[in-house]
């Protein structure tokens, strides 16, 4: 057996502070993003809104002499394409493949539409569950597990209690429940479905690249009793694990960057809220096009004259300003990555679901997160974050991006029909029924089968109930 050295090229995902910031911005809605950027502009002296900078530059040009203007700090809007040496776009694994786009319309009025949204953590997970390739039995188990999660995303009940609640008999054992739980633990946000804090952190570490610095040691730390960390400190933990203090410090910093309450990432909007579209879709000369809405890309600028500001300060203040400058650059790059990723996803959805926009829900094709992730070369969790609480304005109105995804059922013609399309077909049949003799679920199933879409009666009943349509005996109307 010979020892040999091998070298290989590849990309690795390192959970740097700037990457964590980019992930955080990606999963925000436009309204949340505006609040986040406003706070950054308020706290970072090197950031400023573009319109304020342009106004200040105009005042300088009109009111100042050429000699005086050189003494004023100049400002520029940092172009999205500007790169920082210590943080490349490749590190995000979200690089855009071409030109971006924005639709800078006036969205202060009608564009901010008031819609009812009440997405909870359970809603978010159930949506992913229905898109997963699971059997009806496993989906039932999954729904029960999701219902048992607390607001932080943890499963506090033992699997044996879940099994008793299911009441599926001897056909299901605890191992089956555990298998479905592992599937849920792969959903977004990463870390949900954990039974302990250590398991929650381990799940988040598990999605990082194997070469992430400190990952293996961090997994070892979270596998033990976490309460020993503040008690022992880094030095004590290094002695206990027989590792260097530097290695342990690196691993501890990685652990601290994780989210101990992943369920909180999904807000519970129990009341009506204003929704600002993130993208705009329109048809031009027979071709569907997409662009970012103006408010989806907050226009933030950075002072060009920051070097003069730093030179005029003392050493301690100059160090502070350098740190603020680095944070400002990271923020601008995170905004660029968010916009590029969102636009790539929307344009990919357009390629698959143009029929949905032209003809409505009955033309919606089966489409999963995995398919889009595979085409774009991204992780499923990235796609999930990119579409979470995101909306697109279309000729059919403002639509949630998640509405472009649907599970599918095989048809007699060898293709697939999405669950959304089947629901639209059921609604159309019911709308056209004789009010004196409403169609039963069995009759609806027969009519769908005649149309080449074989579905069981119980499936029809499930879809009908999901649309809040009463059973046939309750729909009887006497003229």
From Swiss-Prot:
<keyword id="KW-0805">Transcription regulation</keyword>
<dbReference type="GO" id="GO:0006352">
    <property type="term" value="P:DNA-templated transcription initiation"/>
</dbReference>
<feature type="region of interest" description="Disordered">
    <location>
        <begin position="59"/>
        <end position="115"/>
    </location>
</feature>
<dbReference type="GO" id="GO:0016987">
    <property type="term" value="F:sigma factor activity"/>
</dbReference>
<comment type="function">
    <text>Sigma factors are initiation factors that promote the attachment of RNA polymerase to specific initiation sites and are then released. This sigma factor is responsible for the expression of the nitrogen utilization genes.</text>
</comment>
<keyword id="KW-0808">Transferase</keyword>
<keyword id="KW-0548">Nucleotidyltransferase</keyword>
<keyword id="KW-0804">Transcription</keyword>
<dbReference type="Pfam" id="PF04552">
    <property type="entry name" value="Sigma54_DBD"/>
</dbReference>
<dbReference type="GO" id="GO:0001216">
    <property type="term" value="F:DNA-binding transcription activator activity"/>
</dbReference>
<dbReference type="InterPro" id="IPR038709">
    <property type="entry name" value="RpoN_core-bd_sf"/>
</dbReference>
<dbReference type="GO" id="GO:0000428">
    <property type="term" value="C:DNA-directed RNA polymerase complex"/>
</dbReference>
<dbReference type="InterPro" id="IPR007046">
    <property type="entry name" value="RNA_pol_sigma_54_core-bd"/>
</dbReference>
<feature type="DNA-binding region" description="H-T-H motif">
    <location>
        <begin position="368"/>
        <end position="387"/>
    </location>
</feature>
<dbReference type="InterPro" id="IPR000394">
    <property type="entry name" value="RNA_pol_sigma_54"/>
</dbReference>
<feature type="short sequence motif" description="RPON box">
    <location>
        <begin position="456"/>
        <end position="464"/>
    </location>
</feature>
<feature type="compositionally biased region" description="Basic and acidic residues">
    <location>
        <begin position="73"/>
        <end position="82"/>
    </location>
</feature>
<dbReference type="GO" id="GO:0003677">
    <property type="term" value="F:DNA binding"/>
</dbReference>
<comment type="similarity">
    <text>Belongs to the sigma-54 factor family.</text>
</comment>
<keyword id="KW-0731">Sigma factor</keyword>
<keyword id="KW-0240">DNA-directed RNA polymerase</keyword>
<dbReference type="InterPro" id="IPR007634">
    <property type="entry name" value="RNA_pol_sigma_54_DNA-bd"/>
</dbReference>
<dbReference type="GO" id="GO:0016779">
    <property type="term" value="F:nucleotidyltransferase activity"/>
</dbReference>
<protein>
    <recommendedName>
        <fullName>RNA polymerase sigma-54 factor</fullName>
    </recommendedName>
</protein>
<dbReference type="Pfam" id="PF04963">
    <property type="entry name" value="Sigma54_CBD"/>
</dbReference>
<dbReference type="Pfam" id="PF00309">
    <property type="entry name" value="Sigma54_AID"/>
</dbReference>
<keyword id="KW-0238">DNA-binding</keyword>
